[in-house]
């Protein structure tokens, strides 16, 4: 009887082990894989409103998404920023930079929407202007610095976001309304009436002048979304800017670069 009882205990143990192995390999692991892939393949739907189409019918944007590792500082990235700054000092002035295609087109859209582009400068113009004045760009963290480099390199105003902070699954590009609440990063509440603005389910998240505190990137950001605003309608240039960002992410943010798509 003792031998039979021992055999039964062994069988029970084997059955339990088989049960848990089955749960692990055929239930838990596939679930974890699906959950990871859903996050990695997450893509927001982006709608360009009739408001924007009416003032800029040739608008073309690019959305870059990637899994990333952010760091406080990257010397190699800043070497690239400084090199580009020196190049611009030799080739541009604070007036001629306004003629860069992406900047000129964004300023034109501002005027069409009723906003003074000299008071609310597009971010790309403000960054390059600061360089030309001999001022150092503000250093934040690697993701912020990288997006700034991509913006000044191509002249487009680019929004960088922590994609996990968006509400809902759709972003709509429209025009800011009077009294619409919007907290710019490091700027407090700003007046976005007449500014092109991306909105999620909750409200505004990004304009060509300033992105919103609510969805900003941080040192803990692992899921990045970047929006390139091509108000000049140059799709090839916008694509090149997106591919440039992907290469920077591979070099400086331990990323495989993610992917991008064009929207109009």
Where are these regions (language model features)?
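Single conserved hydrophobic/aromatic residue that forms the stacking wall/gate
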Residues: 1-12
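Generic short amphipathic/hydrophobic targeting helices enriched at N-termini
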Residues: 4, 30, 39-43
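A detector of low-complexity, intrinsically disordered, Ser/Thr/Gly/Pro/Ala-rich segments
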Residues: 12, 16, 41-42
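Charge-biased, low-complexity intrinsically disordered regions
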Residues: 42-264
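Short, positively charged and aromatic/hydrophobic N-terminal segments
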Residues: 14, 28-31, 35
């Amino acid at each position: 009887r003792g031998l039979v009882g021992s055999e039964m205990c062994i069988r029970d143990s084997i059955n339990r082990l088989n049960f848990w192995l089955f749960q692990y390999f055929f239930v838990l692991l596939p679930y974890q894989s699906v959950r990871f892939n859903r996050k990695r393949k997450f893509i927001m739907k982006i709608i360009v409103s009739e408001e924007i189409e009416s003032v800029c019918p040739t608008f073309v944007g690019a959305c870059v998404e990637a899994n990333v590792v952010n760091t406080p500082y990257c010397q190699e990235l800043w070497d690239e920023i400084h090199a580009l700054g020196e190049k611009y000092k030799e080739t541009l002035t604070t007036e001629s930079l306004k003629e860069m295609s992406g900047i000129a087109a964004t300023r034109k859209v501002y005027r069409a929407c009723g906003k003074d582009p000299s008071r609310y400068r597009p971010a790309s113009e403000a960054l390059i202007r600061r360089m030309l004045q001999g001022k150092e760009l503000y250093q934040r963290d690697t993701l912020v610095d990288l997006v700034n480099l991509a913006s000044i390199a191509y002249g487009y105003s680019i929004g960088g976001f922590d994609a996990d902070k968006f509400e809902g699954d759709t972003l709509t590009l429209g025009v800011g309304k009077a009294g619409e609440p919007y907290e710019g990063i490091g700027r407090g509440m700003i007046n976005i009436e007449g500014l092109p603005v991306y909105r999620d389910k909750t409200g505004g998240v990004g304009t060509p002048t300033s992105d919103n505190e609510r969805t900003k990137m941080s040192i803990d950001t692992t899921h990045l979304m970047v929006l390139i605003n091509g108000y000049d309608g140059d799709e090839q240039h916008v694509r090149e800017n997106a591919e440039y960002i992907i290469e920077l992410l591979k070099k400086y943010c331990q990323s495989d670069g993610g992917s991008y798509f064009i929207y109009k």
